Structure formats: structure tokens, C-alpha cells
Amino acid sequence: MYRPIRALIDCTALQHNLSVVRSHTRQARIMAVVKADAYGHGLLRTTQALNTADGFAVLELEAAIQLREAGFNQPVLLLEGFFSAEELEAIDHYQLSTVIHSHEQLSLLLAHRKTGKPDIYLKINTGMNRLGFRPEEESYVFNRIRQWRSDTSITLMTHFSCADDALEADQVNQQLDQFAALHDVKENNLPQTLANSAAILRYPGTHADWVRPGIVLYGASPLPDKTGIELGLRPVMTLTSQIIAVQQLDPSDRVGYGGQFIANQPMRIGVVAAGYADGYPRHAPTGTPVLVNGQRTRLVGRISMDMLTVDLNGISEAGVGSPVTLWGEGLPVEEVAKSAQTISYELLTALSPRVPSISIS
């Protein structure tokens, strides 16, 4: 007997969402971002469904190697680059693309004897202030790399800090202006990649040669004022479970740790096999939406490690074994995230390894 919690992964929804991205970016190539185990959806399952993408972006060298060994021949980009000379050897061997964002990485690169043709993404810090060379350093770094290997393929890259916020267009435009002013954008017409999911949707002028969609591929919105459904996307992950017990409450009965929820009338509650050890947000408050038998209801009381409780008043047919949707089909993950005062990215990527993940189509 297995606990009934499951993450159902709809691979046709992945393909649909990729087609939505293509409809927004008809000329740009698509670098599908599959870091963090494809945002919790499973790396190989996701890349197989997205096999028509023009490239993939990951964080760890191990994930990039896994894609190569699975037979993917598209460019595979390491978003944080490399951390040692040994990793550069592996990048060479597996013909991977790599970001370079620091002088430490540049020094390692220049000391490396590479046999294949290098594919470098030169990251420029235009205002995110996280990774990247300052704009005034770009020409120097570019020239050092070309002196090292004149046949090096170099793509210029930056990342927007506020593309999701409609009130921050000035910041986006300021970053875009800094990028456009780079010496080698003007002089050498280098390939460029700027747009993340939010910029793909809000700023078509940023699409350039490569776009880097992430959250939109998984059916969730990068925009705070819209859900994925409203953007024409389909949810890929549906987190489901079942009711495993029912309790009848009298007025003034309290529920869960701390007794924070107090019944103000006779009511039935269902105990659901899902908790924070499964990746459900512990701080989700009473009132967070849940579906039971496809009907909308609410969480009541605190989330426990392995269980949570839901209001069954008005759902008279619900009982032990009734299906519960925690997010996904019929219940946008953005709604749950907003109630828990977090973001959909965190919910999807925080799914626990103990939750079985099942492909559906």
C-alpha cells in the first residue's frame, strides 16, 4: 500500500507550452531552461518532451552530461559556467556550451588547452548585479578570449531583473540600453541572448538570437497579474492526493498543531496525505484553495509534516479515498503560491523526492 500523493506530469502540456513560446518568438531560437531537475518535473522526461527545442540550459555539469549520454545533440549550456579546470576538460569532451561570468573563470579558460571549438556565453552584468562582467569590461574579455582561440564562438548574454513587473519598464529599458551599447554588439554583431520567460511575453524587442524560457514551459506564469491559463499555457504538474480520514467537529473544536483553527459551527474536515515533507508549503494559511472531488474548498489549520486538513462542508459526498488536487489541473499553482506568500517556482522545484512522479499524456 502506497501513500496516495502523486505528481502527475503531462508531457503533451510541455509540448503545447513550447509551441506558445514559439508563437511569441518566431525568429529567435529557444534555449529551454531545464535546471533544478526541469523545475521539479524530471530532467530526461522533460527534455524528451521538449526535444524540438533548439538547446537546453542547465546548472550542473552532471545534468549536462546526462543529456549528452541520453543522446541529445543540441547545444547544452551551463548557466553558471565551470568551477575548476577538471570541469573544463569535461566541457571539452562532451562539447558543451558554457557561461563565463568572472575573471576567475576567464583565467581558468585561458590556461586551458582545448581541442574542440569553444562555445562561450559571455555574461554581462547590466543591472541584475548577480553574475557577469561590467559593461566596460566586455571588450577586454572578448579580446582576451579571441586571442586565446580565434575560432571561439561567443554569444553575449545578460539577465533582466524586473521583466516580470509592468511598473519596471524603465529598469528593463535601462538594462537593454546598456547591452545595446556594448562594443561588440555594435562592432562584431555577435549573437545575443537576453530574454527570460517574462521578457519573452512583455518585451518582444529583447528576443534577439536566443530566448531562455523557463517557468512558462511548465505552464506557470512569470507575470504577477496573470496565471498561466490566462496566458494560454497548460499546467504540466498536477499534485494530487486523497483523503485518508474524516473528522466531525463541534463548535469550538480546534484543529492541528497549535490549535490555530477553531470551528465556529458543526463541520466535517478531511485529512489529506500531503504535508511539508512532500513539498507542500508549510506556511500556507487557512483559506488556501484546494480541490476535493473537483470542488473548490479550503485548507484549515496548520500544515503538518505528512498531512494537511481541508474543509468538507458543502461537499457531502466527500470521504476517505476522495481525490484531492493541491495544485495543477483546475487549480493554478500561482493561486496556491500567492496564498502561501511565495512563488510558483518555489512550489514546483521544492517537490520532495519521496513523491512519486508519473508521466501522463
Swiss-Prot record:
Note whether Oxidoreductase occurs among the keywords: no
* Domain of life according to the entry: Bacteria
What is one cellular component GO term in this UniProt entry? Answer: cytosol
Please name the PROSITE patterns in this protein's record. Answer: ALANINE_RACEMASE
The UniProt family comment states: Belongs to the alanine racemase family.
| CDD domains the UniProt entry points to | PLPDE_III_AR_proteobact
In Swiss-Prot or TrEMBL terms, this protein is called Alanine racemase
Q: Which GO terms describe its molecular function?
A: alanine racemase activity; pyridoxal phosphate binding
Q: Which reactions are catalysed by this chain?
A: L-alanine = D-alanine
Q: What keywords tag this UniProt record? A: Isomerase, Pyridoxal phosphate
User: What InterPro entries does the record point to?
Assistant: Ala_racemase, Ala_racemase/Decarboxylase_C, Ala_racemase_C, Ala_racemase_N, Ala_racemase_pyridoxalP-BS, PLP-binding_barrel
**Which residue positions are annotated as catalytic?**
35 (proton acceptor), 257 (proton acceptor)
The UniProt annotation places substrate binding at 130, 305
Its pathway, per UniProt, is: Amino-acid biosynthesis; D-alanine biosynthesis; D-alanine from L-alanine: step 1/1
Q: Which residues carry this modification: N6-(pyridoxal phosphate)lysine?
A: 35
* Taxonomic source organism: Nitrosomonas eutropha (strain DSM 101675 / C91 / Nm57)
The biological processes this protein is annotated with in GO are:
D-alanine biosynthetic process
Query: Could you say which EC number(s) this protein's record lists?
Result: 5.1.1.1
The cofactor named in the record is: pyridoxal 5'-phosphate
Known role: Catalyzes the interconversion of L-alanine and D-alanine. May also act on other amino acids.
